[in-house]
């Protein structure tokens, strides 16, 4: 009896070890990120190695993604949980080996993976359009880095009233598709770079037949004119700067005018294609008793109705919600990044954007199985946990079951549906600011 039992156990262990030696982690994770795309990005960035290591560079991309999805876990634990290392004599990987592998990978390869997957997933998603235009928005965000000498030298601190900030910071500008929350492009620099300078880098990455919503911080006639001239029907909408001078050319409707704005010599010097004047469309709307002026490049009143355009600008807030999902939900409100060196800081930031898009693209697939639901009507926090659990499940699954597991994930949209938001039961009230110490009631002054 016992010899037979030991024989069966030995056969089982032999099969497991044989399967583990032949298993390729890229095979199971390839449905999320194409292994050929990762290899191509590594080759284009010049990140190649001839030595066969236990942590291949292709799998280190998944480590960077896991860093963003599992913010509270150490790096070596993420590698062990995802099981992305090649078989070896030791069952686990040392923490120092993960750091060395990150340094070999660098940031350029991860940036290329994010850029290519952003374009690929954006083109593969059937976005809803408004008057034939895809709705985009750009906005800036700050990231805090660990206070190390290397980061301090690479990322100058912002000063307030002559006092430097507590941590070095990175300034980032992202472009987002508003209905799916997919990031389509991103650029970042130091606090010495203005958001307009970073937004210039997004012009070439913006597609045709798009409408980009911006806040008033991006008001620059050179930037806006260059945005329109970079392609076909690349429109923008932005609040008019306070005190801006313009000349009304023609009235298009109630609160709707075609206007002409003069450019400055400094702007024409910086933007060679900028003329002396810029023609735009000015919309004047009243919201809750406040008059707002919106400037846009959509001058065709027949194609773009002014009444709908005024309501369209409120959707710009979707990118703010996207930043909240990244910082509070995915990063667990841990405002300081992990990496202690500038190259690894950039690598970590590209990994955060890549992980966010990965979750959002899976939410798009789940929404396709739900009639009448959009991706932004699903729970982002639940989807994050579901994607991370699936990544760990794929490593232990046989190759034949991987398509079935992926179909199961896409059909799990019922579990992450957000309930319909209930209406307000009581009127909104602004409460009095709490004070640290109690205050005595004021005595009425006596009349002399």
Protein language model regions, located:
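Short Lys/Arg-enriched helix C-cap and helix-to-coil transition segments
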Residues: 108-124
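Short, basic interhelical loop/turn and adjoining N-cap
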Residues: 83-99
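Short alpha-helical "recognition helix" segments of helix-turn-helix
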Residues: 78
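A short structural micro-motif
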Residues: 85, 105-108, 120, 332
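Single, function-defining residue in the core of a domain
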Residues: 1-75, 90, 102-105, 112-115, ...
